[in-house]
A protein has these predicted regions:
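Compositionally biased low-complexity segments at domain edges in trafficked proteins
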Residues: 76-80
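Solvent-exposed serine/threonine-rich low-complexity stretches and specific carbohydrate-binding patches
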Residues: 10-20
C-alpha cells in the first residue's frame, strides 16, 4: 500500500457481482465460473446502512476444491480507506483469524470502497466468504459489491 495511490478499475473485467443479505454471520458466494488469479479485488458499491462505512471482520477466498485457500502469505496490496484515528482498523485485519478485529473505512470517505488482496500466488478462485462485524445492526456491512480477479496486479 502506498500513500496517494488510487485504484483504476476502468476497463477491468468484473468476475462476479451481487449483494449480501443483511445480518450477522458468514456469507458464502460461489462464482458461476472459476477464475484464475493472484490479485483479488472486492469493490464495495453500497452499504446496508445509510452511511459511508465499510467493514470486514474476516475474509476467505475459495479455491478449486471449494475450500478456503491458505491466508498465510496474503498481503493487502491496496485499500482505499482505513480507520486508524479511533482504532487499529487496517485492512490486514480481514485475514488475522480474529473475528473481533476488523477493517473499517474512515467515516467521511464515500462509497465505493476497494480492497485488493495479493494472494501470493495464482489460485483457481471459485468464490469467497465474508464475515461482517459481529455487533448489533452489523455496522459497516456491505450491501452491493463487485469482484475482480487477475493474475497480474491492477493499475494504480
Amino acid at each position: 500500500r502506498k500513500d496517494g495511490e488510487k485504484l483504476k478499475l476502468t476497463g477491468e473485467k468484473v468476475g462476479h457481482e451481487g449483494a449480501f443479505t443483511p445480518g450477522n454471520g458468514w456469507q458464502e458466494v460461489r462464482f458461476a465460473t472459476p477464475v484464475k488469479g493472484r490479485y483479488f479485488c472486492l469493490e464495495a458499491l453500497s452499504p446496508q446502512a445509510n452511511d459511508n462505512i465499510a467493514a470486514i471482520a474476516e475474509f476467505d477466498v475459495l479455491g478449486a476444491d471449494g475450500k478456503p485457500v491458505s491466508r498465510e502469505h496474503w498481503k493487502i496490496r491496496y485499500a482505499d480507506s482505513e480507520e486508524t484515528r479511533s482504532g487499529n482498523r487496517t485492512a490486514d485485519k480481514i485475514f488475522d483469524l480474529q473475528e473481533s478485529t476488523f477493517w473499517m473505512t474512515v467515516d467521511n470517505v464515500a462509497y465505493p470502497h476497494q480492497l485488493v488482496i495479493d494472494l501470493s500466488k495464482v489460485e483457481t478462485v471459485t468464490g469467497f466468504r465474508y464475515l461482517p462485524r459481529a455487533e448489533k445492526n452489523y455496522p459497516g456491512m456491505i450491501k452491493e459489491y463487485r469482484v475482480y480477479v487477475k493474475p497480474a496486479d491492477f493499475k494504480y
